[in-house]
Amino acid sequence: YPDNDCRYFDLDDPKDHYEQLYPTPEMEMTRIHDFIETGITGEFPEFIEEDGSEGQLTVERAIRFAAMAHKGAYRKGNHVPYIVHPIETMMLVAKMTDDTDVIAAAALHDVIEDTQYTADDLRQIFGERITDLVASESEDKRAGQPKGDTWKIRKEENLEHVKNAPVESQMIMLADKVSNLRATVRDFRQSGSDIWDKFNMKDEAQQAWYYKSVAHVLKNLSYLPAYQEYLYMLEEVFEGVDTPPLIQ
């Protein structure tokens, strides 16, 4: 972009002005191409092509809102802007479904859990269905308690919830975890099991328990290429790790 500004990440006064953000198609294609070339994500989904539909506009609003909400945040242990993760999650979901509400919710999936914005904020802009999908992906962080101390109970609650969640919620969770594991694999190839030192849960066996339990509770999505990719990455990262009993 001109002057090295990121039209999604470097917004001034974003809460008031995010709706004014309209990069040109040429700028957008450059950004997408850079994501693909650097290996951050795969091919950008075809749904984002300019068609003027209400569904596309909803997705674009979700992208802009997520970028505004996550401004200034970075992925754990590196300098990658956090917005890369929800965008990658969104693109993975776009390969699973044509439902633009679900795709938009994927872009927003960490907003309630990790930013100042609430479900009521999202509901006013995106309506009930998208907000409910985002809320379904949001953990009770138990404010005021150390994250490491509450990690296990939060993950157990998350897994128990997703077992009976609608398939749309399960798709978002699968995409979220595929995106996380892709980043983990990249770090694992450089640092091995030391990668867990930057996380709230530093016990490799507990991390294996969670990621393998995710595979178990989402096994009804095994027909999706993303699920098979997830299994492949599980094997690489957690091969030989003794794992506690999985959530059934």
Predicted feature residues:
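Active-site helical microenvironments for divalent-metal-assisted chemistry
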Residues: 5-6, 10-248
